Amino acid sequence: MAGGPPDAGMAYFSSNEKTETLIALAWALEEGSRRFYTGLAGSMTDIEGKVLFTELINAEERHKASLLALYHRSGGSGTIEPLLPGGAAGDVMEGGIRVSEALEWTAGRDAADILDLSIALESNAYDLYIKMERTVRDDLAKRVFSMLAEEEKHHLDRMTSLIEKKA
């Protein structure tokens, strides 16, 4: 296995994507991140890290709820899953990497390494939501993606504070 963290590449989308497609993409990435943080919270021995990742699980749930509400306000009905490739949230999270790959990489790593990876993923999500905000035409969708970007920035601030505390 390679020594470095998995590639946190950008999840690309076309500037012509429909708003509902961007909502579905964001929802799937939030679900993947929720799964990642759930895995971390369950396996971490660092108490402060465990508390932070547990709080992030709740934040990702709120993000998904905001995106589902936006989907419904945009005319969608039911759940978002039918819009996703294969009809269900996959194993991909913010950063465009697989949850299973990221969790495998974190096994046996210390809190600082795990926070470094998490910061890279949250930075990617922050960037993605800014791009989505600029891409959509709908004012409500712009506000939701702007709010998500701000929340990702808040997550980054919290992670950065914790990693600095541990340095």
Where are these regions (language model features)?
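Non-heme di-metal
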Residues: 2-167
